[in-house]
Every structure is written in C-alpha cells, then in structure tokens.
Amino acid sequence: MASTSASGTMAVKYGTMKTVISGLTVVLPNGDIINTGGRTKKTSAGYNLTNLFIGSEGTLGIITEVHLRLSPIPESIMSAVCHFPTLEDAVQTAQQVIQYGVPIARIEMLNKDQMGISINYSKLKDIQAVPTLFFEFHGSESSNNENIKIVEELSKDNRGSSFKWAKDLEERNKLWKARWDVYYSVKALINNGRVYSTDVCVPISKITECVNFAEEQAKKFGVRAPMVGHMGDGNFHVVLPFDPENKESYKKIRAFNDTLIRKALELNGTITGEHGVGLH
C-alpha cells in the first residue's frame, strides 16, 4: 500500500498513505538501509524522503517497515444509503457535502448499472438499482446528528430519497455489502472474465463533469461501465468487465481509458488516484 500510495474509502476523513505514514525503513538498491521521518509532529530537516518513497512503486528502494499515525476510535459510527433519480444528482450532492466542509468519514457512489449488478450478485434486499450514495459519519453522537442534518438537506435538494440507516456493526456491514462486492460482482458477469478498472482523480469542483464525461464516452465506445467512486476525494473507478480472449473488446476498453485519462488531465486531475501506474 505504501509503495503505490494507496488509499481506501475513509481517505476523505483519515487521509491516504502519505497522510498516515510518519516514517519508513527502506532498503536502497546498493543494500544500504535507511530510516526516514520519525515520531515527531513536525520536522524541517531537509527533503521529505518519506513522501518520496511512498508511491515510488519499488523504483527507489524496498520498504520494509512503516510507522503509522493512529486515529482514536470514534464514539459513534452511523451509516446511511440514499438513492437518486440520476447519477448527476448523486455526484452533485457528494460534491456539495465536501464543499460545505462536512467532516464525513465515507461518501461512496455506485451508478445504476453497478447497483443492479451488486444487488443480483449479493442477493440484496431493500435497496434499489438506481444511482446511490453510501455515507458514513464518525464522531460524537451530537456532532454526527448535526452533520447528518446538513447532508440530508443537501441530498433532498438534489432529489435524494429518505436515508436508510444502520448503527450497529452487523447492520452497517449489510448496508455496505453492495459497495464491498463491486469487483467480484462485475467479474462474475462474464465466464472466466476479467476486470479492468480506471483510476482517474480530479478536483472536487470537476468531479460531476468528469463522471458525466465517463458515462457519455462509455456509450460512445460501446462498453459496459459499472461505476464506483470515492466522491470525497474526487477519485472514481469505471469497473469494466471483459473476456481476455476477446482482443477487440480489450482494445475498446483501453481506448476508453485513454480518453478518460486525457479528460482528467484536462481538468487538472491525475491518471491514478490510488492504484499506481504499474511500473515494472
């Protein structure tokens, strides 16, 4: 995870690997072992070697040890699902939640196609195959309630449904199952199929434009485009199923990804938000 500068669904609140790692032990190509960073809150001692090695994908050295910053376990954790009539409504809501400065722990998006795939694969009930946002709030009960009011109001303004809530761990896991099963549900669409995932990341102010562009281009290229997004940090994945024996299908997917990458760069984004570039 450190080598690719990975992150997860809670990066919007707790940060990426660059945020949570305070120091590394690294073996350099010549065999030397170095330690970067430390346990202090701050330092002005030269170059930030820790951040240089994070995301370098093994090209500068092999990371053998990491020092992590820990966060306290929140007093209260609350999860919710909200459905929307269009993908644009859902993405716009997420964009506004971040722009309002709501300290949300997770805000994940699944488009209509992905919701349908997940529901069928995981035999889920009480959720709909429509564009959906998954929210999670961490904090004290009172602060969570205040933040929930804001998010519910923003969702309502964008034609969102009433929230479906989960408080205890078992309920939360059921609620999030559609999200956790994304990869396997898409892989199961094709016998012996594979999955190609895009990983562009754009500024929050451009996330609606980029997601809309991805949907338009998927239609243009004739590819099926289930979608999942970490809306809190502008990162989303088009999760494309393909048959490895079908060369033409794979070419189409690569061409679609190239087009999406160019759009992300045009919007001052990046080609990869968390997966890395796959250096060998």
Please state what every model-predicted region is.
Residues M1-E108:
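FAD-binding subdomain of flavoenzyme oxidoreductases
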Residues E245, L279-H280:
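Short beta-alpha connecting loops at secondary-structure transitions
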Residues H230, T270-L279:
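Short acidic/histidine-rich active-site segments
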